[in-house]
Amino acid sequence: MRTQNNLTVEVDCHSLGSNECPSMTSSFSPMDSPTPTPTSIYSQGSLASPGWQDAGSYPGHAYERHTGATPMRSAFRLAGMTSNENMGMSYGAMEAQERMPMPDFLSAYDDNVEHFWLPSDGPKTYETGTHSLPYPHTLPQCPPMVRSNYRPHAAYLPEAATNPCLSRSIFHHAERVPQSMSMGNMMPWIPQATESIAPQTIAPSQVGPVTPPPSYSEFPTSIQTFKTHSPTTPLRSCSIGTASGPDTPISRLSGGAADYLEDFQQSPPFRDGLNRLQRQPSRKMIRKQSSRQNMSLENLPSIIKQVQFKCKEPGCKGRFKRQEHLKRHMKSHSKEKPHVCWVPGCERAFSRSDNLNAHYTKTHSKRGGRNRYVATLDESSPDYDPDFRGQLTPDGLPIRGSTLDDPMPNSREYSVDGLDD
């Protein structure tokens, strides 16, 4: 039968105040814990389990506030561990002679204490997940960057985001380069001669063809400008180092913009695209060239067609498109005037009937004129009758039943020698 003994742990708190270190002297029975563990001595309420909020000296000491002499006088000494020391004592892989028996510390555990062996001078390396006490997670350990002023506790950023040589474009004018991009500020980024950088290589399966930008139709016009422009800025003239591989972006910066453009010109996609542009002009250029050819005098269509009918009368320059027009025009040159005005006393003759009708309308259908008024030719008169042919009164009214052969009434002569308008 196992004898139950009480273990008394005394903690010297002379260096701490009464509020900070309450009485830690109490009786503890190891058999009260169902599963004896090394940390079970903190679960009875007599010895407060140390938390990270109580560790005032973190990261210096992980378990207690070390302000004076060592507070714990017992052999179970846990103070003096740093923040990166291990709390899970890895005793399983140690030799049996290097282990320190647990009954030396806790006399109540007489048997079956194989899993309570603690190393006397075991390595104190921190291993995540080997202890039950909470521990703040730190940032993941990243490979150190090759820099002369590398800070191990700084947050890791990609090289392209922190290196000014890679975060800005190389195609900048000299006046646009800020003062922070001077050669003196870039010296910390340049690796020293003693440091070596592993060549950055890319597998052949990952290397894709170099394709020009979408607007490469405008790119050839500016190639000569880049070639003739001498590098004056540190970004174009400085060499970032020879340890980098031949295909890295850093090697592109060592030669400046001209080398990169020469390599870009030699790429097959660029040559094919340039040749295609030279062989196949755009539709806009084709339309422009065709419009210029059409505007030439030789290709202009004849706006006025060549007339086929000309007046043969000497001195007449009449030109007509139709035969009937020429025939009507030739009557004006002849002496024949078959169309005569029927109004008594007028007797005007015209070579064309349309001219006679115009004479009736303009000369004899108006009152107050020099010519004789005829009521039968006036559309506004109640006696309007364009087919009437006979004698008229002195006022121009028609004499119904008379003919042109009848004598004029009252033997009165009317001057009807009107002039055409």
UniProtKB/Swiss-Prot annotation:
InterPro entries: Znf_C2H2_sf (IPR036236), Znf_C2H2_type (IPR013087). Pfam families: zf-C2H2 (PF00096). The keyword Zinc applies. One of its GO terms (cellular component) is transcription regulator complex. PROSITE patterns: ZINC_FINGER_C2H2_1, ZINC_FINGER_C2H2_2. GO terms for biological process: conidium formation; sporulation resulting in formation of a cellular spore. Disruption phenotype: Leads to delayed conidia development. Induction: Expression is controlled by flbA, flbS and fluG. One of its GO terms (molecular function) is zinc ion binding. A zinc finger (C2H2-type) spans 309-333, 339-364. Residues 379-421 are annotated as: Disordered. Keywords: Activator, Conidiation, DNA-binding, Metal-binding, Nucleus, Repeat, Sporulation, Transcription, Transcription regulation, Zinc, Zinc-finger. SMART domains: ZnF_C2H2. It is found in: Nucleus. The keyword Cell wall biogenesis/degradation does not apply. PANTHER family: TRANSCRIPTIONAL REPRESSOR PROTEIN YY (PTHR14003), YY2 TRANSCRIPTION FACTOR (PTHR14003:SF19). BrlA, abaA and wetA are pivotal regulators of conidiophore development and conidium maturation. They act individually and together to regulate their own expression and that of numerous other sporulation-specific genes. Binds promoters of target genes at brlA response elements (BREs) containing the conserved sequence 5'-(C/A)(A/G)AGGG(G/A)-3'. Required for conidiophores formation. Controls expression of abaA. This is C2H2 type master regulator of conidiophore development brlA.
